[in-house]
Each structure stands twice: as structure tokens, then as C-alpha cells.
């Protein structure tokens, strides 16, 4: 997929330069601009002895008595509010900016020129009377009228400005959450976290708010009516998302300052439509940087916080949904406004309008094809479409606001997106494109070994890489796999693949066509993800199964080698497999555990044929005793032979009793780390049972580390 990423980056760079001189976002609610526009607005209701061929000309800019009246209006309003001449002088720039649309005559005026014009006009100024027409002299407007116009313009502009402020707060909210996560993450390396986890309030928060799943599902997908499927967040992710949704809802619905006199707009409904359109449009754009950052693989917040990539993808999805909702509200509200304002026919011909409609259609298609059913069955098509439509969405949004404001949100998103892609290219280039050895193990497992760079590249337990198999049929695809540093040969990596649909099936076919052993060049990007800091806990329980073995096995090897030095009391690796064929792929790593201080328990979950009356079943219940390595022996079923034998390993038939395993290690002295990676249902059960244990063992510091990731 790297060629798509590169082309996408180039496309975005070209598109971003397609329009010249984008308008910078300015804050309209500043006093000089509000007063200038308010006074220009109130004087615009006056009939002057003035005519112009320009339909949109402004007497306040081109007719001297009107300009003198505007200066006096601003000056008096500032005096009433207690501002000095220095603030008055700041309005001169606002006058020049507003009048630049109508005339260039004011652009060279100095402060002295404006003061002279004000003083000259003050000499002849007359109080305005309602109904006066064809005025040829400067006028003084009633103070209450001026204040009403100021209130009206202030509400209009402040609503627009506060949308940017609220957008910034949403960004700051997620950054703040990640800073808090970073603090908790780095506390894992200190004794303070152990003491913190024993506090009653903290235990209740972790039991009910941060560790458990929602309705027993997180790694395993939910389904409603067999159409709506997807992944639920964990409760901690849910709390973060809920906080964001509350913020977003409040920011979208609260704080509108409506004008009871309808001085700018003809009716209250016009005000509501325009205010909601502006607020929702700005909030939609404020999501750009976060959406780009959370989807990227080189997210600096992930590095500092230890939060998993799968969590950021969960946030990315919710941000995208709310951005789409904002865009729909923006489009509907602005359409309503144009109808109320009787400007529909002219508005729909505007360039910004047409690109806005295009952007809304594109993001709607993106959201629709991001549904779980498309990602599950057509992932490569989804990914390609997501990137292409994403680039088009950037472009249409750019053109939508290029002459308005809000372009800085897109600048930030493009910068984040481009930097991420450049770093990814650097990562792949640094690793090179080595030739890997592929070996078929059993019927559906491939063991891949490949040389890695000697310097500045080392995979920690639980980390993963994105691999592209450089075969002409599927070289563009990039898929994540957990990686192991080889224990057989220094400087090599080991990746275990299990045949599924897609590229792994094609790779297996290629290996089979070459007699079960083959070589192929790879592009490897990584390593990504953080390694769970389990070495800081007294006892470690590693639970794994299915295709989730690499991370826990790597942890077990590392812990086993350092347990004597770090004072580990107990390290237990529990592997649940459906048949023992998968163990052959990990035989070198599992044999390494024989000489380490690690208890290895293997559960075969494959069903055994029912026994007949003629079968003799001998169940030997052995007393718990330890062999030379301290491994506890368990009940065994003699009719279930083990095709692979590892010294000191305890084999079981059936599924592991997660609750029992957790309580066994929970009774040991010292802190406990529980690490899990395996089948989705198994992972969800371990998560929920660990949450229960946190409350049941008040004197014990227990931490749960989940290395299962799916997006």
C-alpha cells in the first residue's frame, strides 16, 4: 500500500497548492471590528444624498458625511465604554479593511487624516431624526440604537469566533487525556502506582469504569439485526468518548447570543439557522487535526501515553462520525438560512457552496463504507477507498473555505498526515527490503524469519510491524503482525502467520508451490506499539491463545531470563490452542522456556471423541508437587496424547478456567500483572474477570495489559 500512500501525499500537496492566497482565519469578535461593522450597519439604514453605479457600494466608505458619521459613532461608543484613543486608532485598520471592498481611497490615509476628518465632521454634526432622508451632513445616532447594533454584531461575530475556541478545547481535551494517561503510564515504572492501586476509590473506579468491557464485548464484535456490527470501546475508552460527546454537544448547543431586534437578520429563524450553520461548520473543521493524528501510525501521543493504536482508531471513528454529523447540520442549517434569506438561487451557484456540497457527499460515502461489515469483508477495498476519498475530502474542504476562513485546521491536518507518511517511508527504507525465509508448519501456519538492521532497531515483546510481501500479485498490501526477536540467531526477526483470507492465503499458496519452503523479499515498517511494563510487577500471568501467542511468549522469555535479577516470585504462561499443530511453529521459543523460571501450561481446546463403554478411561489425579523446575503438575487425561513434549510443561484438555487461574495467582504475595492476547471472546473474559479480581483483592495491586488489537 506504500505506493498509494506516496501518491496520496503528493496529491494532497498538489491540491493544497491549487488555489492561490487562501484567506487567513481572523477573529471577528474583537472590539475594533465589531464597533466598525456595527456603526457601518446602523449608518447603512440611513438615506444619504448619494448615488453610485455600484449596487453594493457603501456610503460609509465612499461618501464623506457618512464616513465622518461612522468615525463619530465609533468614537462615542468607545468613550461610553471607557476606551482610550489608542483603541480608537485600532479601528482605522478595520475601516480600511472593510472599505477595501468598495474603494481604494482610504488605504493611504494616516491616523492624522482620520482625526482631521472626525474633527471636521464634528463641527457640522446634527442629531439624526427618524425618517430623515437625502442627508448631506454628518449625523449623530442615538446611543441606544448604537448599543443595539453593537450587541447584534457582537453576538454574530462572537458565535463564529467561539466555534474556533470550542474546537481548540476539544483538541486540548484529548491532549489532556493523553497527558494524564502518560502520567499513569510512567507511574508503572515506580512503586507509587502499586500504592495507588490499593486505594479504595481507585479500586472501585478501575473495577467499574476503566478495566471492564461494555456488555461483555470489546475484542469480540457486537451485532444488531445482523446488519449493524462493530466493536464497542472498553469502559475507559467509553468514558473518554462520553466526555468528548458531552463537550461537543454543549459546544454545539450552548452559548448563542441572539438579537431580539433582528437588526442584521430579518427574523429569529434566520439568526438561528445562520448561527447554527457557522458553529457546526467550524466545529466540523476543528476535528481535522485529531482525525489525521489518531489515524496515523506515528502518533506522538501514542508514544508518550502508552495508549494502544486500537484505542486511537476507536477515537478516530467517533471523531469522524461527529465530524460528519457537524457537516450535515452545517449543510442543513445553511441551506435553511439561504431559503429564509431568499438567497438560495444565488448561493447554490457560488464556488464555496458547490465544493461544500461535494465535501459533504464525499464524507458521507466515507462514513458509509467505513461500517464494520465493509472493513471485515473488503478491507483492502475499504482502505484504498478511504485514502482516495480522504484526499478528495481534503481538497473539497480546502476549496470550500479558501476564500472564507478556517483553512488553518486543514493546514494542521495536512502537516500531520504528510509527516506521518514521510516517517513511514523512512522506516521502510531504513529496514531495507531483505529476503525472508518462509516455512510452512502444519497445514496453515507459516514461520517467517528475516534479518533486521543491527543498529537502532529492536523489537520489544508485544510490538508489531506492518509487512508487505513483495510479490507482484499483492505487493501493495500492508498488514500488521506481532514480531519476535529470534532466539536462534541474533539479528533476525521471527513472524508467525496463520492462513486466513486475503494476503496470508496467497502467501501460503506461494510457499506450498515451492515445496513448503520459500524465500521472498519483504518491506517491513515498524516496530510499533509499546511493550507492557510487566517486569515491574512481582507476579505475572500471561494468557494467550489462537494467533496471539508471539507477544506473551516474548514476555515469558524476557521475564524468565531476568526473573532472578528482578526478584520475580511467579511467572506463568497459559496457552490455549485448538490442537497442538500451532505449537510446532513456536517450538524453538517454547523449548527456550524449559531452562527458565516460567511455568508453562498448555490447554488443548479441541473436542475429544466421546468414550464408548469399551473404552478404558484412566484419570490420574496427582497431588500437587513440584519438579526440579518448580512446575506444578495438574490432572491429565491419558487418552489425549501430546504430539509435542516440552520438559516441565503441564498439558490440559479443555478450556482454561480463567476465574480459577486469576484467583490462584491473586492469592500470591506481591503485585500482579495480567497480560492477555488471544481469541476475542477469551480476551473479553480475561478483562472482565481481572476487573472483578481488582475489587476482590483489596490489598493487592493488580494491572491488566491487553495486547490484542483489532481495527
Curated annotation (Swiss-Prot):
Heme 2 binds at residues 330, 400. Its main location: membrane. GO terms for molecular function: ferric-chelate reductase (NADPH) activity; ferric-chelate reductase activity; metal ion binding. One of its GO terms (biological process) is copper ion import. The chain crosses the membrane at residues 167-187, 238-258, 281-301, 322-341, 354-374, 377-397, 399-419. GO terms for cellular component: fungal-type vacuole; plasma membrane. It is an enzyme of class 1 (oxidoreductase). Keywords: Cell membrane, Electron transport, FAD, Flavoprotein, Glycoprotein, Heme, Ion transport, Iron, Iron transport, Membrane, Metal-binding, NADP, Oxidoreductase, Signal, Transmembrane, Transmembrane helix, Transport. Residues 415-534 form the FAD-binding FR-type domain. Induction: By iron deprivation. Belongs to the ferric reductase (FRE) family. This is Ferric reductase transmembrane component 3.
